[in-house]
Amino acid sequence: GDIQGVNHGLASLLQLIMTAKDAQLPVLTIQDKPAFGYRGLMLDCARHFWTVDELKETLDHMAFFKLNTLHMHLTDNQAWRLSMDKYPDLVKEGTYYYDFPELSGKYYSKEDLKEIVTYAGTRGIEIIPEVDLPGHCIACRIA
């Protein structure tokens, strides 16, 4: 066992306690292992921006349910959410919503992504960033 196995064991124990009558558990032996290596979800951060705090809360929930992969869809026709030093207009122009200006200008800096990856890593979760090219690139072309 590694630390992730310990974390998963503690999550199983907490889940049992939460559902046990009067928080009492019988003496038991648990044999638990995942059926699949990839246990994750995908968030469309391009069309529906998630703040760093919202992502951290999601990562906490993922860890509780023993998920190990978060696929972040960072670019699409509607917005480019990935800051790139060489192309600053991608987040300046590529995040503008003409129909919903209050959603405009939101993106992830390099520091944001480092923070998210580090936070996820401490919970045994891998981040898969997705840049949707060559299709779905209207936001990129606008910038």
Spans of features found by a protein language model:
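Feature activates predominantly on carbohydrate-active enzymes
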Residues: 1-143
